[in-house]
């Protein structure tokens, strides 16, 4: 239909009428989706995946990591920056970060002389947790019992630091693309005297939903995704892995327990075993997607601790976020710049397309499959 003779307002109205008459397809037409957990929107522009890529290409990292490097401060027996020598650990190893962003004895900034210049005290502790004594392994290449030991250590440090601090943030940055400067398998744990911004948003959203509907937001969300199935990646007896309806990063996933669980220490032995198994499968799929050690940032969110530990916090549901940056290949990543920084998040691949691709991937790591083929060829 031609609208060339109409005035601008008529053309706008006619254009809107044409758009309404068209059949909407999420995989072809741009739209915005709401994230009820963090009270924000994301622009989905799936048609952009058809454009040729002429942007930055990251170098492929083919460097072999030595199993043990005496100069690597995370290795067993190595000397760290503060002069302390690591024990010869053979499992997980937790220690105080030598360069902490939070310290327990920081002074109070005092009162502000103007409402536009507010500062408040920030205290806490920062720890580093090594997952394994070897530098040349990552979580998907570790055994299920080894991953289970990591989960137990996560639960223990949450309980320990949560006795004093209202928020304990466990997070892993994997890969140089995510700013990880050391290839040794490890995560960080920051406990703070305040509730960080994202935790505050999740607290408000879950509290509001629970007040309005009488059930935890993420527990209900998990049930709905099990019914709809199109965004599921993995399911097990106790856990669900899915690409959220509101995902921002290309292959972002959300890891949820099937039952109502508020914090990591509440997981029973069967749930911890099952979590180790499904984590290994998810991270193997990630690596298999582009046959690379898949970079990501991940972290756990649970009910606030400290003085809130004894509170019911029934609106909270434990969950883990995985935010991987890769989009088209092992060397092409998603950049959060421009529109994302100044307006709102935007993604190209739909969450349903991402989930379908992840679902279809094998659960045997490509490195192990390659070794099996080489062994068979020799035999």
Swiss-Prot record:
Annotated EC: 2.7.7.12
An example Gene Ontology molecular-function term: zinc ion binding
Biological process according to GO: galactose catabolic process via UDP-galactose, Leloir pathway; galactose metabolic process; glycolytic process from galactose; UDP-alpha-D-glucose metabolic process
Coiled coil, from the record: none
Cofactor: Zn(2+)
Gene3D superfamilies listed in its UniProt record: HIT-like (3.30.428.10)
Chain residue ranges for the region called Disordered: 1-20
Annotated active site: 186 (tele-ump-histidine intermediate)
Pathway this chain belongs to: Carbohydrate metabolism; galactose metabolism
Binding-site list for UDP-alpha-D-glucose: 81, 97-98, 173, 188, 334-337, 339-340
PROSITE patterns attached to this UniProt entry: GAL_P_UDP_TRANSF_I (PS00117)
Residues that coordinate or bind Zn(2+) 1: 75, 184
Keyword ATP-binding assigned: no
Record carries keyword Zinc: yes
Compositional bias (Basic and acidic residues): 1-10
Cofactor note (record): Binds 2 zinc ions per subunit.
Key words, A-Z: Carbohydrate metabolism, Galactose metabolism, Metal-binding, Nucleotidyltransferase, Transferase, Zinc
Catalyzed reaction equations: alpha-D-galactose 1-phosphate + UDP-alpha-D-glucose = alpha-D-glucose 1-phosphate + UDP-alpha-D-galactose
Residues the record lists as binding Zn(2+) 2: 202, 301, 319, 321
Its biological purpose: Plays an important role in galactose metabolism.
Recorded family membership: Belongs to the galactose-1-phosphate uridylyltransferase type 1 family.
Subunit and interaction comment: Homodimer.
Name of the protein in question: Galactose-1-phosphate uridylyltransferase
């Amino acid at each position: 239909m031609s609208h060339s003779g109409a005035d601008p307002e008529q053309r706008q109205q006619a254009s809107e009428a044409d758009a309404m008459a068209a059949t909407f397809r999420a995989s072809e037409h741009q739209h915005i989706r709401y994230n009820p957990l963090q009270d924000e929107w994301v622009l989905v522009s799936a048609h952009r995946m058809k454009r040729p890529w002429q942007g930055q290409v990251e170098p492929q990292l083919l460097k072999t990591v030595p199993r043990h490097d005496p100069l690597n401060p995370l290795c067993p027996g190595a000397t760290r920056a503060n002069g302390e020598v690591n024990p010869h650990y053979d499992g997980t190893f937790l220690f105080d970060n030598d360069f902490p962003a939070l310290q327990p004895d920081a002074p109070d900034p005092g009162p502000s002389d103007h409402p536009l210049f507010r500062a408040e005290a920030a205290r806490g502790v920062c720890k580093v947790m090594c997952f394994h004594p070897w530098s040349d392994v990552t979580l998907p290449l570790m055994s299920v019992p080894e991953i289970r030991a990591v989960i137990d250590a996560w639960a223990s440090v949450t309980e320990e630091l949560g006795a004093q601090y209202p928020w304990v943030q466990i997070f892993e940055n994997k890969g140089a693309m995510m700013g990880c400067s050391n290839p040794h398998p490890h995560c960080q744990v920051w406990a703070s005297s305040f509730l960080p911004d994202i935790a505050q948003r999740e607290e408000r959203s879950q509290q509001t939903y629970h007040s309005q509907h009488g059930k935890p937001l993420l527990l209900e969300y998990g049930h709905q995704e099990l019914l709809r199935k199109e965004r599921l990646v993995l399911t097990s007896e106790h856990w669900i892995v899915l690409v959220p309806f509101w995902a921002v990063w290309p292959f972002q996933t959300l890891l949820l327990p099937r039952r109502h669980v508020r914090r990591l220490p509440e997981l029973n032995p069967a749930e911890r075993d099952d979590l180790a198994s499904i984590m290994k499968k998810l991270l193997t799929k990630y690596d298999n997607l582009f046959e690379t050690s898949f970079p990501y940032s991940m972290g756990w969110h649970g009910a606030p601790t400290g003085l809130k530990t004894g509170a019911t916090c029934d609106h909270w549901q434990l969950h883990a976020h995985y935010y991987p940056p890769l989009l088209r290949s092992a060397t092409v990543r998603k950049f959060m710049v421009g529109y994302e920084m100044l307006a709102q998040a935007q993604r190209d691949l739909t969450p349903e397309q991402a989930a379908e691709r992840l679902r279809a991937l094998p659960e045997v790591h490509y490195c192990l499959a390659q070794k099996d083929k080489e062994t068979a060829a020799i035999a």
